[in-house]
């Protein structure tokens, strides 16, 4: 044995042990039990926490408002809005179960809940994001059907079919997101305080295709077809409406009672005018579908802008390490996708007055009491109200045509003057309603008018509890003239176009024999 070698080995052992000991505590490949926590920057933690906390709170409140708006307003319960509610549910689930823990990770700089919960968090993240974009894919298909087949839409897209489509969305989202929980992921890091999205190359490619690129292709194809169909159909229908308006010769106002609404429709058919089969009705329904498509097109556009950078960076960084972005850039891209969850509750009220009014009623705690006022407004510009007293009555219309269109979707504006006939709400028709009474109006009737009948003494400004009647606009004169005056049976109509405001005021005493 060489003593020098033995001596050298023995003298170097303590030094080697010291180096090994230091490496265990400070080396880069440290274990979870020996790792040290990163130093917390209090100022940065507070500022980031406040910003992300406000963002998460806004996303939660906004998506709850969207859900309650549809739940508390019967006229918003349409198949299209069911898809919107499903999108809000996905964003709400993301805001409750994913974003708080993502914000904690950003504030503290490390994961505090262990490896198992990290895997669950990542899977729920993929689930919610996939459900969101698949909901947008279903919305785009729904909008194409609504624009392409606007008259047949209620029979093609029923509530049952919409619910089945929503269930399919969540089933597909679960299939795409469950892979990492079943072991389809990269090996877990040694440090349990590290947590992030799965970057296993093939799963990253699979999830990007299933969660984003394939639905995105469907969305773009559907909205391109919507644009083509909308442009062609609008041109054809507007041309038909102008031709129909030129052939119209009269403006008829009728009072409908509860029991004789169908008789009123038959009287209009006898004059050769069928509101339900007119081109104007088709244009109105098509315009409503096209407006909804525009609103949801904005939603889809913002979703693409928010999530496209992430779904570009994730597969490229997983497949090619040289193309992986810096951590700071990846965090910004990551949270940009999350930011989409609070955008939709902003887009809906800005693009739809129905959602805006629903939001205001809910914020004012008027979810239930607002229903009755909404029904009154639905009569609005195209349905006037009359409550009889002894032998007189009060007939008043002060709702603009535009507001009535936004509330009920049953009136038209612009060139859409021929209105679909719709029964008044049964809740506003008293018992013992009288037969319909035909009235007439000045031929130069314009939107934004105010009609009134004399009120009996002592009853001014008061509403009577008697039966409520409505009369609706069923036609339009070809040109001003005296034909209406000759057949009005004593009604005195005058125009009021002061200051360039279209409208008229008319005093029309009702015939006593009708009540």
UniProtKB/Swiss-Prot annotation:
Q: List GO terms (cellular component aspect).
A: caveola; cytoplasm; nuclear membrane; nucleus; plasma membrane
Lipidation feature positions (S-palmitoyl cysteine): 365
Glycosylation sites noted in the Swiss-Prot or TrEMBL record: 10, 24, 34
Which keywords accompany this UniProt record? Cell membrane, Cytoplasm, Disulfide bond, G-protein coupled receptor, Glycoprotein, Lipoprotein, Membrane, Nucleus, Palmitate, Phosphoprotein, Receptor, Transducer, Transmembrane, Transmembrane helix
Record's Pfam families? 7tm_1
Motif Nuclear localization signal covers: 368-378
The places in or outside the cell where this protein is found are: Nucleus membrane; Cell membrane; Cytoplasm; Membrane, Caveola
Segments on the Cytoplasmic side according to the record's topology features: 71-83, 142-161, 225-295, 352-515
The segment annotated Disordered runs over 392-428, 473-515
Q: Which residues carry this modification: Phosphothreonine?
A: 264
Query: Disulfide pairs?
Result: 118-195
Q: Which domain of life is it from?
A: Eukaryota
- Any GO BP annotation: positive regulation of cytosolic calcium ion concentration
What Gene Ontology molecular-function terms does this entry list? Answer: alpha1-adrenergic receptor activity; protein heterodimerization activity
The effect of residue 293 to X is:
Confers constitutive activity
Transmembrane ranges, per UniProt, are 46-70, 84-105, 116-141, 162-184, 202-224, 296-319, 327-351
Under the subunit heading, UniProt states: Homo- and heterooligomer. Heterooligomerizes with ADRA1B homooligomers in cardiac myocytes. Interacts with CAVIN4.
Record protein name field: Alpha-1B adrenergic receptor
Recorded name of the encoding gene: ADRA1B
């Amino acid at each position: 044995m060489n003593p020098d070698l033995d001596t050298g080995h023995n003298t170097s052992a303590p030094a080697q042990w010291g180096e090994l000991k230091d490496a265990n505590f400070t080396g880069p490949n440290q274990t979870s039990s020996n790792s040290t926590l990163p130093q917390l920057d209090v100022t940065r933690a507070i500022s980031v926490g406040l910003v992300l906390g406000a963002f998460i709170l806004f996303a939660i409140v906004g998506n709850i408002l969207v859900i309650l708006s549809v739940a508390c307003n019967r006229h918003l319960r349409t198949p299209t809005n069911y898809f919107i509610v499903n999108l809000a549910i996905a964003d709400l689930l993301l805001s409750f179960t994913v974003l708080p823990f993502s914000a904690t990770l950003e504030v503290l700089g490390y994961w505090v809940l262990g490896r198992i919960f990290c895997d669950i968090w990542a899977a729920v993240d993929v689930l919610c994001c996939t459900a969101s974009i698949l909901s947008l894919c279903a919305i785009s298909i729904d909008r194409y059907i609504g624009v392409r087949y606007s008259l047949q839409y209620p029979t093609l897209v029923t509530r049952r079919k919409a619910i089945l489509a929503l269930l399919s969305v969540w089933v597909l989202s679960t299939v795409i997101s469950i892979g990492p929980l079943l072991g389809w992921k990269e090996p877990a890091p040694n440090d349990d305080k590290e947590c992030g999205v799965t970057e296993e190359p093939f799963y990253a490619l699979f999830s990007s295709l299933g969660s984003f690129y394939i639905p995105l292709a469907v969305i773009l194809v559907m909205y391109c077809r919507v644009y083509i169909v909308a442009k062609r159909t609008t041109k054809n229908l507007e041309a038909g409406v102008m031709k129909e308006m030129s052939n119209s010769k009269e403006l008829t106002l009728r009072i409908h009672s509860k029991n004789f609404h169908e008789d009123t429709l038959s009287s209009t058919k006898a004059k050769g005018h069928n509101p339900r089969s007119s081109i104007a009705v088709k244009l109105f329904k098509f315009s409503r579908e096209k407006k909804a498509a525009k609103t949801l097109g904005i939603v889809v556009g913002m979703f693409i802008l928010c999530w496209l950078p992430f779904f570009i960076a994730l597969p490229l960084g997983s497949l090619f390490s040289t193309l992986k972005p810096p951590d700071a850039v990846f965090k910004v891209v990551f949270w940009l996708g999350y930011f989409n969850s609070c955008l939709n509750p902003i887009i809906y009220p800005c693009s739809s007055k129905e959602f805006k009014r629903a939001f205001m009623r809910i914020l004012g705690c008027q979810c239930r009491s607002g229903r009755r006022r909404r029904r009154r407004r639905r009569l609005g510009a195209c349905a006037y109200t009359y409550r009889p007293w002894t032998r007189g009555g009060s007939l008043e219309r002060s709702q603009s045509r535009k507001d009535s269109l936004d509330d009920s979707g049953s009136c038209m504006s612009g060139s859409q003057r021929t209105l679909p006939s719709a029964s008044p709400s049964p809740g506003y028709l008293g018992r013992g309603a009288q037969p319909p009474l035909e009235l007439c109006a000045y031929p130069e009737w314009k939107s934004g008018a105010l009609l009134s009948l004399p009120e009996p003494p002592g009853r001014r400004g008061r509403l009577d509890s008697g039966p409520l009647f409505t009369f609706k606009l069923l036609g339009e004169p070809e040109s001003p003239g005296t034909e209406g005056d000759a057949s009005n049976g004593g009604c005195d109509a005058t125009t009021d176009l002061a200051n360039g405001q279209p409208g008229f005021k008319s005093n029309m005493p009702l015939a006593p024999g009708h009540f």
